[in-house]
């Protein structure tokens, strides 16, 4: 399995289009622009579509996204060999741990404790080779 198969993870509020936090391995500006466009499209269509698992595929990478109530969207970019089951397991774990609720009231973004908890979880799943 490729090192660091999870390339990018974004948590955002799809009702406002605000990014709450992100986790990223090396991502170039072109890929980051692509991710932001995908998130913007998700925000336009996410209303009322809760807990629907979605996938966008390409030759080498896949995007997975899902929105939970009230309007927290997770967008994950992984290499195309990374198991879909593990992507949604990671998202469920982040959601269960209530990481999106760890908000800094001034910035309206996830606080440092939440960012560290997210980083720790992603690193576990980076190395997870369970099939």
Describe the predicted segments one by one.
Residues 2-6, 15-131:
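Acidic, low-complexity cytosolic segments
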């Amino acid at each position: 399995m490729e090192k660091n198969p999870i390339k990018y993870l974004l948590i955002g509020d799809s009702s406002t289009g605000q990014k709450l936090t992100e986790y990223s391995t090396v991502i170039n500006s072109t890929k980051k622009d692509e991710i932001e466009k995908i998130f913007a499209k998700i925000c336009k269509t996410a209303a009322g579509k809760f807990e629907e698992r979605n996938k966008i595929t390409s030759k080498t990478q896949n995007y997975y996204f899902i929105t939970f109530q009230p309007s927290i969207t997770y967008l994950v970019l992984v290499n195309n060999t990374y198991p879909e089951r593990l992507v949604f397991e990671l998202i469920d774990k982040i959601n269960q741990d209530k990481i999106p609720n760890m908000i800094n009231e001034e910035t309206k973004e996830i606080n440092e404790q939440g960012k560290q908890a997210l980083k720790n979880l992603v690193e576990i799943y980076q190395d997870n080779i369970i099939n």
